UniProtKB/Swiss-Prot annotation:
Alphabetical keyword list: 2Fe-2S, 3Fe-4S, 4Fe-4S, Electron transport, Iron, Iron-sulfur, Membrane, Metal-binding, Mitochondrion, Mitochondrion inner membrane, Oxidoreductase, Transport, Tricarboxylic acid cycle
Membrane spanning stretches: none
Name of the molecule in the record: Succinate dehydrogenase [ubiquinone] iron-sulfur subunit
Binding-site list for [2Fe-2S] cluster: 73, 78, 81, 93
Protein residues bound to [3Fe-4S] cluster: 174, 221, 227
Start and end residues of each 4Fe-4S ferredoxin-type domain: 154-184
One Pfam family of this chain: Fer2_3
Cofactor(s) the record lists: [2Fe-2S] cluster; [3Fe-4S] cluster; [4Fe-4S] cluster
Pathway: Carbohydrate metabolism; tricarboxylic acid cycle; fumarate from succinate (eukaryal route): step 1/1
Location, primary (coarse class): mitochondrion
GO biological process, one term: tricarboxylic acid cycle
Length: 262
């Protein structure tokens, strides 16, 4: 039997079965009046794909169809399968199964309301993203068929920003966001905000900056840097937030006429 459910690890000697992984999944349903619990499953590496998402799909298809989780691209592009694996926020489609630990603990993203099992409610997260107006705002005629020119140098300013997939791994790892998620925008949304602030094609740089000048929206960041450590795309939200603060400081000290894109 290569895939089965266990009630306790004591029924399996994992030290003698190195090709097996014990998967412990957090379970809870917000629609039911039950306390959270853990379901434990065993997956054989011999007939399962190499990543955690493969194991979750195998468990759902062959053992327990009630296990709920999000997934889509399987390539680290969409960010749908963001969960907490062994205490670290990551994408299930990027985290390998063949790690040193025989037991793999799988939780939903921390400090976000759980809908069911590994599925969290991202309503507030997306509402905050909408708040920064994440689209190009230009005074040029939008009906024109001619593209808005951007130099190669200006394009380079977007590197390390546009790659963000809004998986929420960074925001869910930030203690400041845990305590102030209703006011603090969090590292993911602030990184996205900076992506539009530095875009040379956008004409609303000043208003975008001023909209972040708030003791909670921006300044709850205390450079703990969990966001940078956990980002599956290897981005640096902490550095980006510091850059936003610096630009606002320059604006206050040197005045609005300063080149905000420098």
């Amino acid at each position: 039997m290569n895939l089965f459910s266990l009630k306790a690890e004591k029924f399996l000697n994992l030290k003698t079965l190195s090709d097996l992984k014990l998967i412990k999944i957090f379970r809870w349903d917000s629609s039911e009046k039950k306390d959270p619990w853990y379901s434990t499953y065993v997956v054989s590496l011999k007939n399962c794909g190499p990543i955690v998402l493969d194991a979750l799909i195998k468990i759902k298809n062959e053992c327990d169809s009630t296990v709920s989780f999000r997934r889509s691209c399987r390539e680290g592009i969409c960010g749908s399968c963001a969960i907490n694996i062994n205490g670290t926020n990551s994408l299930a489609c990027l985290q390998k199964l063949n790690i040193k630990n025989n037991i793999i603990y799988v939780y939903p993203l921390p400090h976000i309301f759980v809908l069911k099992d590994l599925v969290v409610d991202l309503t507030n997260f997306y509402a905050q993203y909408r708040l920064i107006q994440p689209w190009l705002q230009s005074s040029l005629n939008i009906k024109s068929k001619k593209e808005i020119y951007q130099s190669k140098q200006d394009r380079l300013y977007l590197d390390g920003l546009y790659e963000c997939i809004l998986c929420a791994c960074c925001s869910a790892s930030c203690p400041s966001y845990w305590w102030n998620h209703d006011k603090y925008l969090g590292p993911a949304v602030l990184l996205q905000a900076y992506r539009w602030i530095v875009d040379s094609r956008d004409d609303n740089t000043l208003s975008r900056l001023l909209s972040l000048k708030d003791s909670y929206k921006l300044y709850r960041c205390h450079t703990i840097m969990n966001c940078t450590k956990t980002c599956p795309k290897h981005l640096n939200p902490g550095k980006v937030i510091a850059s936003i603060k610096k630009r606002l400081l320059n604006l206050e000290v040197l005045g609005e006429k300063r080149d905000l894109n420098s």
